[in-house]
Amino acid sequence: MSCQTRFDEFLVLEFSDPGYGAVHHLTVAAYLLQHSSQLTREGWLYERDLLRAFIIENKPPSLIRKQNRDKVDSGKRDFKIKSKTGQPVIAKTTWAKTICDVRAENAETYCADVTEWAKSAFGESEKIVIDG
């Protein structure tokens, strides 16, 4: 199963069951961090900063949304998040954990696995230096 297929299935699960949706913010940020061709350089750095806020600073998504409202408003933002070229922002990386390692048999297991995956992705991403 491809990462994209798995991601799409998990989004459906997260939007249809609040127990799974509790980690939606981590699912999206970790996935995008590991699939840099979907982002601009600034977008990739922004997603990494989001994971830092969620994981290291333990900030809830509601606070981050409030703090970043103007920063990510497409009418006010001074950078693009989504890539128009599809070119990877980072060199090909072999990640220790990916979305394919997440189990979905119940919400508790799913949330624990997504959290561990996001922590792993963030930790590895901290070692990646992006020129520019």
Where do the model's predicted regions map?
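Intrinsically disordered, low-complexity linkers and terminal regions
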Residues: 1-132
